[in-house]
């Protein structure tokens, strides 16, 4: 029996910026890939998550959101701010996004390494700051979205993402639904 969700995918877009240099962008990309693989391998999500890269500029955000709008397989977009991602760079893309949006407010690491933490770690792992600013700009713009707060590997977080994915699939099906009233 075919899974009705197999025809769909949800795109995962990470927010960052080039301020911290190329090594940071490489690390952000590696963390994002690990998260997407972990989400898909959890067995808890009905729709495949596809990593669409790290957006480091307004133009990159706009391009990926336009592509999401034009891809029938994409039924929603998950955003995550790995480092401090300036909220203003998301404005034009958010204005154009027509697909359901989930803001995943999480950290890559479950535990904070208090004993070894240094400025490099802090610069790379600013999800709390970036996610708050992203949430603020979405609220100011009145962007409809689902916000999921919690560690990305936890059962409750995965459950909330899965529920949202099923809603996205229903939304996608309704976009070309023909009804006849008798």
Regions found by a protein language model. Give the residues of each.
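Glycine- and acidic-residue-enriched helix-capping/strand-helix junction motifs
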Residues: 17-33, 121-127
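Short, well-structured alpha-helical segments in soluble
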Residues: 61-75, 91-93
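Conserved small/polar residues in nucleotide/adenosyl-binding loops
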Residues: 180-182
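Periplasmic-binding protein-like
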Residues: 74-84, 102-104
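Short, acidic/small-residue loops that bind anionic groups at enzyme active sites
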Residues: 92-118, 122-133
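Structural motif
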Residues: 53-66, 157-161
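Short beta-strand elements in bilobed, periplasmic/extracellular small-molecule ligand-binding domains
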Residues: 38-54, 144-150
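A charged, well-structured terminal subsegment
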Residues: 134-168
């Amino acid at each position: 029996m075919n899974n009705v969700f197999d025809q769909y995918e949800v795109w995962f877009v990470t927010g960052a910026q080039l301020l911290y240099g190329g090594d940071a962008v490489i690390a952000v990309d590696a963390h994002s890939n690990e998260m997407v693989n972990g989400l898909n391998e959890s067995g808890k999500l009905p729709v495949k998550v596809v990593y669409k890269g790290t957006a480091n500029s307004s133009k990159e955000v706009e391009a990926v959101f336009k592509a999401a709008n034009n891809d029938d397989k994409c039924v929603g977009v998950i955003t995550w701010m790995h480092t401090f991602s300036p909220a203003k760079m998301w404005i034009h893309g958010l204005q154009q996004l027509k697909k359901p949006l989930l803001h995943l407010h999480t950290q890559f690491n479950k535990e904070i390494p208090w004993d070894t933490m240094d400025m490099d770690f802090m610069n790379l792992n600013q999800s709390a700051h970036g996610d708050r600013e992203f949430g603020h700009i979405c609220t100011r713009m009145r962007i409809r979205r689902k916000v999921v707060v919690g560690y990305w590997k936890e059962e409750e977080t995965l459950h909330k993402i899965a529920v949202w994915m099923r809603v996205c699939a229903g939304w996608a099906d309704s976009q070309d639904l023909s009804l006849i009233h008798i």
